[in-house]
Amino acid sequence: MAVPSAHEFHWQSLARLSSGRVYHSLAEVGGQLYMLGGCDAAGRPTSSLELYSPEVDQWVSLPPMPTARAGAAVAVLGKQLLVVGGVGKNQHPLKVVEVYNTEEGKWRKRCSLREELMGVAITVKDGRAFAVGGMGADLLPRSILQQYDLRKDVWALLPPMPTPRYDTSICLQGSKIYVAGGRQCKRSVKAFEVFDMDSRTWSSLPSLPCKRSYSGVLWDSTGRLCWLGGLRLGGIHQSSKFTKNVNIFDPSQGSWMRSEDTVSMKTKRADFAAAIIRGRMVVAGGLGHQPSVLDTVEAFHPEKRKWESLAPMATPRCSASTIVIRDRLLVVGGVNQIPSSAHEILYVKEEEIL
């Protein structure tokens, strides 16, 4: 299937949130979009759970979470939403775990984590959730790898990561969990490691080419890791700089592609929305060297080997929560000086939206 051209991508504004929101979590169950928690305009974690109904283009309030939280890790286990960690009302990490049954419309508290954690990454394999890393109440990163069994309601410890970290990017490929980058005490790390579920062992991979934060991290259809843009933190005598670099790791080769074989983005940016839509890497919004939040959008054309500008976002913002449902990118909330209530979708014109 040919990739869509730049002019075929269109934005549409959808029903706004009831109030500005940031650091909320999104999940899809049966094609339905759920939004959980996040911080309000005053920076307070919320307990709200909302469902977006595309048929009538509106948000519907559902029973709130028992525990208010922001930045939670959410995993979909069948028809249930598993909510793990995050930051609570006291601005401290949480250990409480809760599950929402989308068919029953009810919340249940489940077996807690062994300790309070925020910045946990999570993935699902064969009906079990795997929680990776996190930051504890002492503000130190963790190397913990935990497996949750919903039927038994129990967390099991697996061999820890070689490199402790939080806010990492993970991807499940077959029976392997790839863990790329992350942070330690607010500093970014270059560590890139993989956990083999069959042998229950960790292996180190070639490190990320440079330390940078707030990058876009994508895994394409061939299993390659694409590391886009971000903020390179300066040292004692250097200021931090936004970058437009693109780095690609090919698991089949076990190495990072040479910089001359990749194509940089048009605009330097960090903290932006990123997704792969119909075979094209897309980046939208974020922060750059400009004085205001970005509204620019660009997409990489793999055959032309260049980035092309798309129509801009209607609402410029950074720190938005995103999810791809049926090859449509939904960008929900975020920040433009204050938390935003904007909710927009990027889709290819030849298709019907949602």
Stretch-by-stretch model annotation:
Residues 1-354:
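Kelch-like beta-propeller repeat domains
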